[in-house]
Amino acid sequence: MKLLTLTNERDNIYFAFEALQNLNYVPQNHERHWISIFSDFDISIPSYGEQQKIGALFKEIDSTITLHQRKLESMKLLKKSLLQKMFPKSGETVPEVRFPGFTDAWEQRKLGELGTTYTGISGKTSSDFGHGDARFITYMNVYSNAIANPLMVEPIEIDQKQNEVKVGDVFFTTSSETPDEVGMSSVLLEKQGTVYLNSFCFGYRPKEKIDLHYLAFMLRSEVVRKKIIFLAQGISRYNISKNKMMEISVPLPTIEEQSKIGGFLNNLDNLITLHQRKVEALQKLKKSLLQQMFV
C-alpha cells in the first residue's frame, strides 16, 4: 500500500482527494513505481478558503450518495426477505408473512394447468436483425426484469410466421452459464406495435385470471426459483426443458390476496428504482462537478 500525505497542513484533505481523483491516472502493466510518477503531477490549488468550500461540497455529495446507497441496499434486502416470507415454503399452505384479513389456505397449481407456451423467434439469420417496423424482447430484458422493460427491445422485420407477444404473457430464459440463473422470468405489462420474443426464451400465456404483478414476483420467489433451478441440466452451460417447466407447481392465493401482494411488491420495486436513480443522478452530478471545478 502506498500513501500520499499533505505537506501543508492548511490544505483541505477532501479537496486534495477529489483533485487527485480528477487526474484519471491508471498505472500500466503492474507498474511498481507509479507512486513517484503520480507524485510529480501538478494540480491547481486555490486559496485555503476556496479549498474549504469545494471540499465541503464534495464531502456533502459523498455523504448523500452513501445515504441513498444504504437505503437502496436496505430495500433490496427487505425485498429479498419478503420474497422468502410472503410465499408458502415447500409443503406448506400459508406464508410466514401475510396481510390482515386473509386466512384461506393457498392452492398449488401446475404451470401447465394455468397456461400454454409458445416459442420465440425462429428461422432467422443475423442479417434479419437491426432493422424493421417490429420489435423483439431481448434476452437481457427477460433475465434482468421481473416486469419486462418496454424500452429494452430491438428492431426486426414484421413476420406473420412468428409468435407475437401479448400483454400478460410471461417469458422464461431457457439457457444460462450457471444453474442459479436459468429459467429467469419476466411478465409483459405493456407494449407498442408488433413485438416478438427473442429465440433464447420461450413464452407462456396464462389462460386463467392471475394478478400480473403477483405473477411477476411469485415466479421470482425463493420457493419457485428453487424448483426451477432443480430442473437445470448441463455442465458448461445449463438448459431447462419447457415441458419440465410446465410440471412445476406454483402457489396461488385468492385473486384479492394476489392483488394485495403484487401491489405491495411492485411499490417496493418502484422505491428501489427511485433510490437507484437518485444514486446515479448524484454520481453524474459529482462527475460533472469534478470536470468543471478542477483544471
Feature locations, PLM:
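Extracellular/lumenal glycan-associated surfaces
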Residues: 52-64, 68-71, 107, 259-271, ...
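A short beta-sheet element
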Residues: 1-19, 34, 138-139, 150, ...
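DNA target-recognition patches
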Residues: 125-156
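Charged, alpha-helix-forming regions
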Residues: 83, 89-100, 108
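A short glycine-rich beta-alpha junction/loop motif
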Residues: 1-2, 28-52, 122-125, 131, ...
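Extended intrinsically disordered, low-complexity coil regions enriched in Ser, Thr, Gly, Ala
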Residues: 65-80, 89-91, 272-287
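Non-catalytic DNA-recognition/assembly elements of restriction-modification systems
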Residues: 98-121
